[in-house]
Amino acid sequence: MNKTVIKNKLKQESFVPSKKMGQNFLLSNEIKNKIVNVANISKDDLILEIGPGWGAITELLVQKTDTLVAIELDKRLYAHLKTYIKAPNFHIINNDVLCVDLDKLILDYTNTKKNQKIKVVANLPYAISSKIVLKIIQSKLINDAYIMVQKEMAERIGAKVNTRGYNAFTVLVQLFCKTKILFQVNAKEFHPQPKVQSAVIHLENLHNKVDFDIEQVSKFLRICFLNKRKKLKNNLSNIYDIKLVNEMFIDYNLDMNLRAENIEPKMFLELFNYLNKSNNE
């Protein structure tokens, strides 16, 4: 389905993209193929597509895998895809992805006889992309995700320590997986054209799970990055006893002038465990 066909279909069916749902349809055949190719899909892989929209990427994915599961909230697009993609390996759910138990859904379509990898390939709705990313990384079954998000979001997810974009969300995501920005996508490749640029990012090795309470760690990270220009010690002393914070810095041989942006993701988890274990004793 090329850009002319998509635009004509939208016009013929008087389809008005929903701003509330963050609908921007990818038009470029080159970008669609590029996304599918970087995902390195085999027939045995189970592919989960979140927000398939008009089916631009869907029609390529369905040719690559024996099992494609899509989640679409918009009833209009759900009805369109049920008619447009008529393949036995295509399964579509009409629901809000934030309300779906992803692992339960995946298990419904998993073939235990195959050495299946579970991959997410999707152009995410930008309005809720951070919430979807958090849902993906918490899955116990998803191996990899190749997702298109707002460029600024991709840069946050993929930021390195000691860089400006490195923040609490960066650390939380990188505690679950490796991240890599694959390529950027110009706004002109979409209809309607968004006001921001986009990028495709790879969330890799999602089975490398860390056992912690994500809500508690997320709250801790927000405290650490509350004021990025303040010393980490000062941010933490707003919540924890200053004596305990100083003892931790000494025990870990940390510079008292460190800021949150200077610390690697895994170290934050150690600091969290230290402070909360001591608090509970």
Swiss-Prot record:
- What are the record keywords, sorted? Cytoplasm, Methyltransferase, RNA-binding, rRNA processing, S-adenosyl-L-methionine, Transferase
Q: Where in the cell is it found?
A: Cytoplasm
Per the UniProt record, which EC number(s) apply here? 2.1.1.182
Catalyses:
adenosine(1518)/adenosine(1519) in 16S rRNA + 4 S-adenosyl-L-methionine = N(6)-dimethyladenosine(1518)/N(6)-dimethyladenosine(1519) in 16S rRNA + 4 S-adenosyl-L-homocysteine + 4 H(+)
Ligand binding (S-adenosyl-L-methionine) = 24, 26, 51, 72, 96, 123
Signal sequence residues: none
The record's section on InterPro entries has: KsgA/Erm, rRNA_Ade_diMease-like_C, rRNA_Ade_Mease_Trfase_CS, rRNA_Ade_methylase_Trfase_N, rRNA_adenine_dimethylase, SAM-dependent_MTases_sf
Taken from the UniProt entry, a GO cellular component term is: cytosol
Organism's domain of life?
Bacteria
Q: Which SMART domains match?
A: rADc (SM00650)
> Its Gene Ontology molecular function terms?
16S rRNA (adenine(1518)-N(6)/adenine(1519)-N(6))-dimethyltransferase activity; RNA binding
The record describes the protein's role as: Specifically dimethylates two adjacent adenosines (A1518 and A1519) in the loop of a conserved hairpin near the 3'-end of 16S rRNA in the 30S particle. May play a critical role in biogenesis of 30S subunits.
The family assignment reads: Belongs to the class I-like SAM-binding methyltransferase superfamily. rRNA adenine N(6)-methyltransferase family. RsmA subfamily.
Q: Which NCBIfam families match?
A: ksgA (TIGR00755)
Name listed for the protein in its UniProt record? Ribosomal RNA small subunit methyltransferase A
